[in-house]
Design a protein with these regions (language model features):
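Short helix-loop "hinge" at the ATP-lid/N-box region of the Bergerat-fold HATPase_c
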Residues: 53-54
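Conserved catalytic submotifs in the C-terminal HATPase_c
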Residues: 18, 23-33
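Short beta-strand/loop element within the Bergerat-fold HATPase_c
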Residues: 60-72
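A conserved beta-strand-to-alpha-helix junction within the catalytic ATP-binding
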Residues: 1-11, 25
Length: 147
């Protein structure tokens, strides 16, 4: 069940959020049913995006995760309240080794997160859509997977 699966991911991510004082809100649509996917790979993709959102969220900020089905796709939208994507990042963030934030060139960041996420989603026949949220001004990443 997709709602239960996303609840488990929220529980895992919430402990990371608590250490940074960030609230994680999960909203799932009704009657989502089940999804045929590699659950571990999909979890890694979702956690990569949530981790990025955590890194770019302001203190006491909120990360919004919404899950809904439209047409033949499941949409998992992850939106933060940070500064959003630069125009350059919108075009290149899914490329290997791209780092939009040059201050993050530490041993912990290699510019692989969204590249790996995009690769996982493509393996599932899906698409990763990057934009800036009109609601929060922050980054919005939508994972679209065929249902």
């Amino acid at each position: 069940d997709i709602a239960d699966y996303m609840g488990q991911i929220k529980a895992q991510a919430s402990s990371l959020c608590l250490t940074k004082g960030i609230c994680l809100q999960l909203e799932t649509g009704a009657n989502l049913g089940t999804l045929k996917a590699d659950k571990l790979l999909l979890e890694r993709a979702i956690m990569n995006v949530i981790s990025n959102a955590l890194d770019h969220s302001p203190p006491q900020g909120t990360i919004y995760v919404t899950v809904q089905k439209t047409d033949c796709f499941l949409h998992i939208s992850i939106t933060d309240e940070g500064g959003g994507f630069t125009p350059e990042a919108l075009h290149h963030a899914q490329e290997q080794f791209f780092m939009g934030d040059k201050s993050r060139t530490s041993n912990m960041h290699f510019g692989m997160g969204l590249y790996i996420t995009s690769s996982i989603i493509k393996q599932h026949g899906g698409q990763l859509v990057l934009s800036n949220s009109k609601k929060t001004g922050g980054a919005q990443v939508i994972i679209k997977i065929p249902y």
